[in-house]
Amino acid sequence: MTDVESVISSFASSARAGRRNALPDIQSSLATGGSPDLALKLEALAVKEDAKMKNEEKDQGQPKKPLDEDK
């Protein structure tokens, strides 16, 4: 029972009383996942893919020069 008593006393002192606020603190230091960075990483990935697609479209529209024509 001592484990339960310590949880109850820490909850009572946390000022999270009431039916709506009776949730554990999910914003702890352990909850720092990679989800905030995910949007930025996906945005950077999308930009790189767009640039690659634009370069491929440019290359397809222009005929390639043979190396011997420069001379």
From Swiss-Prot:
Q: Does this UniProt record's set of keywords contain Phosphoprotein?
A: yes
Naming one, the record's GO cellular component terms include:
cytoplasm
Region entry Disordered, spans: 1-21, 51-71
Q: Which family does it belong to?
A: Belongs to the PKI family.
Name the organs or tissues of expression: Testis.
Q: Per the UniProt entry, what species is this protein from, by scientific name?
A: Rattus norvegicus (Rat)
Keywords (A to Z) from UniProt? Phosphoprotein, Protein kinase inhibitor
> What is an example of a GO molecular function annotated in this UniProt entry?
cAMP-dependent protein kinase inhibitor activity
Q: Which residues bear the site annotation Important for inhibition?
A: 16, 19-20
Q: What is this protein called?
A: cAMP-dependent protein kinase inhibitor beta
The Gene Ontology biological process annotation of the record reads: positive regulation of telomere maintenance
Statement: the UniProt record of this protein carries the keyword Phosphoprotein: yes
Q: Which residues carry this modification: Phosphoserine?
A: 35
